[in-house]
């Protein structure tokens, strides 16, 4: 029973990811005919909101689903820098949010996060990193499944 309870949160995220017919489906802008970052603006402010709620998480300028800093904006701290590099990687791979290399690099970067956070941060960096890790681990798993299917394997 404990095994299934541990899997429940990941299974719900995995189910959501599997319902997406293409890896680009995570980009809501594709469904709406526009890119959220272009229409809603990009972040120039270090934020710390919804720290443990993955779909709503806003951390620094770059961490969060469909949330990113403006071009040229410096990250707020080490965790935010990991998210900035991940955002750039995803951008250079056709907005493929399930790109295994980008996601595994983010996980490695999160493992190395240390140092001070930004002034006014209301999030516990370790908890926030754990939330991001859970989402990205699920994306790695889904990416491996969906990309095998896309490759005809």
Curated annotation (Swiss-Prot):
Presence of the UniProt keyword Lipid biosynthesis in the record: no
Active-site positions on this chain: 86
An annotated GO BP: arachidonate secretion
SUPFAM superfamilies: Phospholipase A2, PLA2
Catalytic reaction annotation: a 1,2-diacyl-sn-glycero-3-phosphocholine + H2O = a 1-acyl-sn-glycero-3-phosphocholine + a fatty acid + H(+)
Manner of cofactor binding, per the entry note: Binds 1 Ca(2+) ion per subunit.
Cystine residue pairs: 42-70, 46-76, 51-123, 63-83, 82-109, 89-102
Residues bound to Ca(2+): 62, 64, 67, 87
Cofactor list: Ca(2+)
Keywords attached to this entry: Calcium, Disulfide bond, Hydrolase, Lipid degradation, Lipid metabolism, Metal-binding, Secreted, Signal
Position of the signal peptide: 1-25
A molecular-function term among this protein's GO annotations: phospholipase A2 activity
E.C. no: 3.1.1.4
Similarity field: Belongs to the phospholipase A2 family.
Protein task: PA2 catalyzes the calcium-dependent hydrolysis of the 2-acyl groups in 3-sn-phosphoglycerides. Releases lysophospholipids (LPLs) and free fatty acids (FFAs) from membrane phospholipids in response to hormones and other external stimuli.
Protein name per the record: Probable phospholipase A2 homolog 2
Source organism of this protein record: Oryza sativa subsp. japonica
Gene: PLA2-II
């Amino acid at each position: 029973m404990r095994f299934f309870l541990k899997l429940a949160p990941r299974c719900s995220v995995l189910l959501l990811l599997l319902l997406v017919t293409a890896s680009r489906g995570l980009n809501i802008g594709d469904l709406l005919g526009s890119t959220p970052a272009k229409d809603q603006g990009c972040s120039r402010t270090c934020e710390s909101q919804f720290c443990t709620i993955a779909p709503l998480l806003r951390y620094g300028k770059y961490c969060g689903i469909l949330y990113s800093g403006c071009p040229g904006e410096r990250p707020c701290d080490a965790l935010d820098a990991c998210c900035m590099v991940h955002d750039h990687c995803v951008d250079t791979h056709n907005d493929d949010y399930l790109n295994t290399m980008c996601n595994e690099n983010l996980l490695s970067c999160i493992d190395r996060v240390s140092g001070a956070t930004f002034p006014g941060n209301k999030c516990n960096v370790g908890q926030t990193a754990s939330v991001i890790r859970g989402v990205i681990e699920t994306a790695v798993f889904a990416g491996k499944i969906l990309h095998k299917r896309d490759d005809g394997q």
